[in-house]
Every structure is written in C-alpha cells, then in structure tokens.
Amino acid sequence: MVSSVVEKTSVAHKETALILWFEEVGTHDVGLVGGKNSSLGEMIQQLTNKGVNVPSGFATTAYAYRYFIQEAGLEQKLRDLFTDLDVNDMANLQERGHLARQLILDTPFPQNLQTAIAEAYGAMCERYGQKMGRTGVDVAVRSSATAEDLPEASFAGQQETYLNVHSLSCVLESCHKCFASLFTDRAISYRHHNGFDHFAVALSVGVQKMVRSDLATSGVMFSIDTETGFKNAALITAAYGLGENVVQGAVNPDEYFVFKPTLKEGFKPILEKRLGSKAIKMVYDVGGSKLTKNVEVAEPEREKYCINDEEILQLARWACIIEDHYSGVRGVYTPMDIEWAKDGQTGELFIVQARPETVQSQKSANVIKTYELKDHSQVLATGRSVGAAIGQGKAQVIRNVSQINQFRPGEVLITNRTDPDWEPIMKQASAIVTNQGGKTCHAAIIAREMGIPAIVGCGDATDTIKTGEDVTICCSEGDEGSVYSGILNYEVHETELSNLPRTKTQILMNVGNPEQAFGFASYPADGVGLARLEFIIANHIKAHPLALMKFDELEDPLAKAEIAELTKLYAGDRPRFFVDKLAHGIAMIAAAFYPKPVVVRMSDFKSNEYANLLGGRQFEPKEENPMIGWRGASRYYDPNYREAYALECQALKRVRDEMGLTNVIPMIPFCRTPDEGRKVIAEMAKHGLKQGKNGLEIYVMCELPSNVILADEFSEVFDGFSIGSNDLTQLTLGLDRDSSLVAHLFDERNLGVKRMVKMAIETAKANGRKIGICGQAPSDYPEFAEFLVELGIDSISLNPDSVLKTVLRIAEVEKALG
C-alpha cells in the first residue's frame, strides 16, 4: 500500500491538503478531488478486496487549485475576461478561452505546491522501484473537475489527459496544463450549457501509474446498453493500444454484449461479438519528441478480436461489482461508464476510471418514444446508429476543428471524428455523422447526452455527402443507421406506459431482429411468442448451413469466395460460424425479455428461400410448390438435412446451457403428423436438447389442418401450441397466399378458419396444454383479437407496433366478459 511510502493525511487536514493519495479519498470527497479521483479512491478502498484491479496514484486537490488562483491573484482577471462572453459567438469564445488559459500557464505554481507534487511523485517512483532522476515511473496525468461525473451531467473529456508522463518536470508541466484546461473553449461552453458557475468549479489533477496497454488493449465499458437503456446488459468496447483512441472515436473498436443476471449466476453469457476495424493504435513514442503516437495495426491483428472470452467475462463481472457498489452507496440504481486497460507486460486487466452514466439513467422509463421513417431514398452512408431517432437538415462537411466557424445551427455535422473541441457546435447540430468511432466514442456519448441522432463509423461519409445537400439521418431502423438523400417524411409516436392496464391474456411480441430486442424490452409485453430464426440466418449468417459444412465441395466460385470472406475468422471451422451467429442472435432476444418466455421457432425457410442463401442452390431441390413442400419438421430428420439442423440445436443448447437463458422455448414449424414430431424431438435429444431436461419445453406450430384435427395426439408429443394464422388460413381455404390471383380470398376472419382456431384452443385446453397465436391476424384485425380472448386463449403474440393499441382493446374485452 502507498501508506508504507508516505504518511496518510489526517481527516482534519484533508480540507487544506495540497496532495491526497487515492487510498485516502472516496465518493464523499468529490469536493476535494473531483469525481474522477474520488471514484478511483473509492474503488481502491472498497473493491480491490473483491478482485477489481485499480492502479494507484495521488491527486492534487481542489484546494491546491484555488490556492494557486488566489496566491497569484488570478480570479478577478479571469472574471473580467468572462463578463460579456457570448458562447454562441465562436470567435468570441475562442479568444476568451485562449486568454484565460494563457493567463494560467504564464503564472508559475507556488513553491510549496511544486514541492508537494515532487514529494508525491518521488514516493510513487520509490514504490515502483525507480529513482526520480531525469526519468521516473510512467504515469497518466488526468484532470478531474469538482463538478465532473455528477450523474446529471457528464464532463467526460472536458479537461485534459496526458499519458506516458515519465519525469518530474513533465508531471509538473502536465499538472499546469490541466489547471489551464479548466478554461478550454469546450469546457467553458459546456459549463454554460449545463448551468455551472465557472468559478464554483475547481480542478483536481490525478497522477496514476500507467497500465502498459500500449503493449496490449484497452477500451470503455458501460454497465447498461447505451442506446436503449436496457439495464441487464454490459457493453464492452476494445481496441489495441492506449485507450484515448476509443474514447475519442479515432478507431472503430470491437464490441461485446454480456448479460449480467446469468453472469452473476456463473454462466458465460456473451450475447454478441462484433469485430471492429481497429486500424490504428496509440503507443509510447519511445525516443521521439512526443509522449505518445499512433501507429497502424497489422492486418492479421485487425481481423481478430483483441480480447478473449474470459477477459470479456472478467470485465463484465467487474462492471457488475462496480455498478452494484455505486448503487448501494447512492441508494439508487447507478449504471456506470468505465474505462479499462490490459497491461501487456503482466497480462493483467485494470480499471482506470469509473463514473456514473449520465444519459439513460436520467430518462423516464414510463414513456416510449418511437420514430418511423415513412419514405426512403438513395442511401449516402451507413454506420452504427446512436439514439433511436431521426434528424435532418443541410449537410455541413467539416474536416478539421479549425473550420468549425463555418457551421450553422440546425445543420447536419459530417466529419471524420469529434473530440471535446467540437462540443460548442455539436449541440447546435440537428444530427452528427462521423467516419470513425464506435458506440462508446466521444461523438456517441455527447450525441446521446444532447438527444441528437448520430451515425458513427461510416468510413467514407465525408466523401459521399456534400456540403449543402439536404439529408435525413435515420437511427430508428436498428443497429445500422442510414444517411438518406433529401428531407424525408417521418412520424414520432409517444406512449405513456404508466396508464396501461394489465390483461389476463398474456400479451407477447413477435421479434425477428436481435438488434431491436433491447429496445422492445421496455414494452408492456409478457415475453416473445415468435422469435424468427430466418432473419438471423438471412441477415447475419447469409450462407446455407450445408455450404459451410461442405465448403471444400462448393461448385459456385463466387459463392465460395463470398463465404470465405464472411467466415475468415472461422477458416478452420466454418460450421461454428453458423452456431456462433445463431446463438448470439437468439441470446440477444432471450436476454431482452429474461426471465419471461421467449418462443424460438426453428428455421422455416422454404426450399426456394434456402436456395437463395450463399451456396444454397447446390443443396436444394427445385420444387413446383415449395410452400407445401420440403419445409419445417420434414427437413430436420431427413438424411439430406439433419446435420444442418444439428447446428441449430447446438446454438440453442449453448444459449440455454452455457448462457443460462432457460427462458428459451424451441418451437417446431410445419409438423404434419405426431410421428414426425416424435422424430424431430428424438433428433433434438441427440444434440443435447432433451425434452424435460433443465426445464426444456418444446412447442409446435398449429398451422396445418392436421394439427387441429389431431390436436389430442399432438398434445401427447408437445408441451404447447402456437397458432400460425397465416398458414392455417391458406391451407384451410386451399389457396396460395403468395398468388395475387387468389389473394382477395385470403382472410383469417373466414368462418372456416375461425372454427379451426376454436377447435384448436378447446382441444389444447382440454389436454392441459398452453396455446397461443403468433400470426398476423390479431395485429391486423382487433375484432379477431376479441374473438380469441372470448375463447380463452392463453397468449396473443403481436407485432411491436400493435402491442400498445391491442392491450387497450383486450383489456376492454376482458372487462366486458367479467
């Protein structure tokens, strides 16, 4: 401990101490050392015994800053500078900021402050076995404002950070620059914007032992999903080298989601892994003129994840520990924004900063606000969406911060990346688009905080979008955001959840896109009645499972090349690509609604649709009528497909057994006979999905007349039914729903179809089996939903956009029925 090197300051003297060690401060000391340093001290004191590694160090106090300002007589001079400041006048702001910083830099530290810093740095050198000569121990010097990291406002990046500082003279110079950084243009603007008095804020400087992540990796993590506010997932970003590139958005990092509830139970629930380009890394400038420099990352390193699964899980565990601790200290749920680093010399992971998250934690959980784009046009750029909203205006392409005076309020900012110097104009933008950055970069954090839609990591937006052209930025269509040409029509819907009634009938949701699942988690639904695997396979996997299993036998050279590129991380085991991607997609949906039931329908492509997957034509027959051909259950046990179905089973088993998401219920589609059902269940058992084991239930789609007529027999095989009204309608009426010639006859409200539905519900209930519906009918026709409630159906699964209005209608029906 540091106490073996220096004496700890007594409580009585903390208020007037110039230096305090991290071990001496905690969350109650924000006024003394700022949010950043008090948080480091809190973690060192309270969490190291729980296995959380935090590098040690010391802080200059807020008292030291005020003492410096007072001793030098600077306060009145600074006040005079800001008497008639106009923060919206960029030239005025830049001039006043420059004069304020120069005033501080031109004024030397008092001798006793220099001595205090020198003694503390000397003690750190001694602690790490180095002498304080021309060089000493390498440290990070970071500013920490006394108003920083309060939960209501993020001052992230408002002041300066200096890495690889390794001599006393450099430490003193960096501390001086940190003091001056209290008056950077962005900090002045930010305080004004958030209503902070410039002179009520003081500055503390943290001097912390460097973690040698220049030789390894680093990143940012949040103990909450930054986009949707979903509380049960930790988001981790990672890139090579020092962490500044991730924070500033200079690099597109890898991203990982981990599910916190089952992680705490000992499972390994990595929900998603997304590879970033990681083109550059920040390293020590050994022998150079600067402290750090950026170098290119070698191609093989870019094309693999930069931390392994155990490190992902370890970081997520720490995120849980840190969040739980701060929530306990504050007496209210407190999601955290955390910076981490891996030491390349020791292989150890460290937490180097932690602060309360400042956007999602402030939002009302009782209002759902959704944006719907009504038109589409040419797509100019795509990237990661930030904030599920839509913005539009004239594009302003700004390639350098020196050009920000060209920006006008209401324009769409298009740039390479942002850092805190850009903030004075960011708050004036209707939307922000950057070439670089991930979901935790500076542009993303500030855009979220200001409620501005942003798209980051586009790659080439500054080339494909021209200054002056009208654009619409859409972040409401999932994880990928799009920049559209022109001003497009859109609608905004707001729903107050606190007044919604509860219904006896379970209201479930149909969810296909895993990227939207966290956003749907706040809807008033009792789970998922239909999670479609087709979306995941078509959009995330893209290749036919047999094309992955028999890659060397592929005859189509174009498909083979595309699959090779798609699966380059899996060159030695391409089927694992299918299992990983499918498991991640299922897990994202299951986690969003955990522990509520999530019914996952096994793949139900028709043979012509399977053929359209990469490499698929080689493995699929040409059928005259694929709608009623080789689909659903009949494929799963067929010698020509069973090994591909095994991959689906492996993915499902991983989600349930390794991730702990036992709320997943597999459902078999298009099962023509009870005997066919038994064959499929036997096939699943071969791959570890044994009915009844670990609470596993298996449902069947009730979508064929035979499912209804033989419902007693199907009840002996399956644990529940879900009526598929689309197929049941076409097969009851004997028509092809894809044919425009007979489309006018397709109607779920037909008396014959309704009798089928009635018979299915009555037979299932007589056999003690659950029965719901997941077809389109209840979403499209409120009177059909009423019909189902009157029959006593257990659950109705709806499209997300129908949930709210249908809940109200069903509540009325239930009330009328008494």
UniProtKB/Swiss-Prot annotation:
The keyword Ligase does not apply. Its EC number is 2.7.9.2. Substrate binds at R532, R601, E703, G724, S725, N726, D727. Pfam families: PEP-utilizers, PEP-utilizers_C, PPDK_N. Pathway: Carbohydrate biosynthesis; gluconeogenesis. The active site is at H442 (tele-phosphohistidine intermediate), C774 (proton donor). Mg(2+) binds at E703, D727. SUPFAM superfamilies: Glutathione synthetase ATP-binding domain-like, Phosphoenolpyruvate/pyruvate domain, Phosphohistidine domain. Its cofactor is Mg(2+). Belongs to the PEP-utilizing enzyme family. The N-terminal domain contains the ATP/Pi binding site, the central domain the pyrophosphate/phosphate carrier histidine, and the C-terminal domain the pyruvate binding site. This is Phosphoenolpyruvate synthase.
